[in-house]
Curated annotation (Swiss-Prot):
Pfam families xrefs: Ribosomal_S21
Protein name per its UniProtKB record: Small ribosomal subunit protein bS21
Nucleus listed as a keyword: no
HAMAP family attached to this UniProt entry: Ribosomal_bS21 (MF_00358)
Transmembrane recorded as keyword: no
MF (Gene Ontology): structural constituent of ribosome
NCBIfam families, per the entry: S21p
Amino acid sequence: MPGIVLRSDDNFDASYRRFKKQTDRNLIVTEARARRFHETKTEKRKKFLIASRKKMLKRLYMMRRYESRL
């Protein structure tokens, strides 16, 4: 669990920023959002297929963009 030690010269904004960085690195917020609602296997499969399709289209776009420069 992330935690920060408050320094005497830190203000609230700096401390909050350090805490937020730690939680982002540990993926705590994203994991909590994922566990908030139960996902069925079908929903997981759909998300995976959408993500893979998106990756493929991105690669295709980058490849076409690269080829157009040649």
